[in-house]
């Protein structure tokens, strides 16, 4: 599933193409994705001007001049295309007044499209329970330590809980925990202010670096332009089981990156440097 950096990258690509443009033609190929698409969806979008975009966690809002926003969720395999020939499983096509063509392609149909009043975006059922944005100033060591206090789950599982912090997924949690030197299996309630003081900057730096690289291309994800993301080339632990840890002096000190499974998801870490 695309995580925060991939969604941010997609949103920026769409904003560059769509902001200020009118939607001259809207084609919806099916009435539902993961959930039913609202009746009148095409009519509400047709002729509307795109005023801007906003990301919340792994969700995007395309804001229209009708006090309405289109919620877009890429799900597991969804992607947006710009000026591409129609693709299989392209469920939504937007054509602008200057001739740009935007497509929403989702082979597995775990994505979502919905309409919400712009003023009520944060009240949408998919948004209301989300935790803070990790790149906002309000996400601090103090707020994270408070959210984790008393939790008996491993820190990795806690960070994947979207009510604790929004937008993180398996890749970036693994990478941030490595940067912070924190073992993924450590109980979340033992993090405290001290370790949170390392973890919060590590999360922010990991996400910032990933956005700058256009995200991580893994299976289905590409940028709207069709380009791959490049952050997968900078992974320190994710999908690197058995490979050397860059922080360790060599095989005599470290067996390399370890892999375990937590809650059905692969976890990667260095047992020597993460505690």
UniProtKB/Swiss-Prot annotation:
Keyword list, A-Z:
DNA damage, DNA repair, DNA-binding, Glycosidase, Hydrolase, Lyase, Metal-binding, Multifunctional enzyme, Zinc, Zinc-finger
InterPro entries xref list:
DNA_glyclase/AP_lyase_DNA-bd, Formamido-pyr_DNA_Glyclase, FPG_cat, MutM-like_N-ter, Ribosomal_uS13-like_H2TH, Znf_DNA_glyclase/AP_lyase
SUPFAM superfamilies on file: Glucocorticoid receptor-like (DNA-binding domain) (SSF57716), N-terminal domain of MutM-like DNA repair proteins (SSF81624), S13-like H2TH domain (SSF46946)
CDD domains, per database record: EcFpg-like_N
Q: Where are the zinc fingers (FPG-type)?
A: 236-275
Quickly give the catalysed reaction.
Hydrolysis of DNA containing ring-opened 7-methylguanine residues, releasing 2,6-diamino-4-hydroxy-5-(N-methyl)formamidopyrimidine; 2'-deoxyribonucleotide-(2'-deoxyribose 5'-phosphate)-2'-deoxyribonucleotide-DNA = a 3'-end 2'-deoxyribonucleotide-(2,3-dehydro-2,3-deoxyribose 5'-phosphate)-DNA + a 5'-end 5'-phospho-2'-deoxyribonucleoside-DNA + H(+)
Q: Which residues form the signal peptide?
A: none
**Which processes are annotated in GO (biological process)?**
base-excision repair
Molecular function, one GO term = class I DNA-(apurinic or apyrimidinic site) endonuclease activity
Residue positions of the active site: 2-3, 58, 265
Question: Which sites bind DNA?
Answer: 89, 108, 151
Enzyme Commission number(s) from the entry: 3.2.2.23, 4.2.99.18
Indicate the transmembrane segments per the record.
none
On whether Cell membrane is a keyword of this UniProt record, the answer is no
Cofactors, names only: Zn(2+)
* Cofactor, how bound (note): Binds 1 zinc ion per subunit.
Key word Lyase present: yes
Superkingdom assignment:
Bacteria
Task of the protein: Involved in base excision repair of DNA damaged by oxidation or by mutagenic agents. Acts as a DNA glycosylase that recognizes and removes damaged bases. Has a preference for oxidized purines, such as 7,8-dihydro-8-oxoguanine (8-oxoG). Has AP (apurinic/apyrimidinic) lyase activity and introduces nicks in the DNA strand. Cleaves the DNA backbone by beta-delta elimination to generate a single-strand break at the site of the removed base with both 3'- and 5'-phosphates.
Family membership noted in the UniProt record: Belongs to the FPG family.
HAMAP family recorded: Fapy_DNA_glycosyl
What quaternary arrangement does the UniProt entry report?
Answer: Monomer.
Listed name of the protein: Formamidopyrimidine-DNA glycosylase
Question: What is the species of this protein?
Answer: Acidiphilium cryptum (strain JF-5)
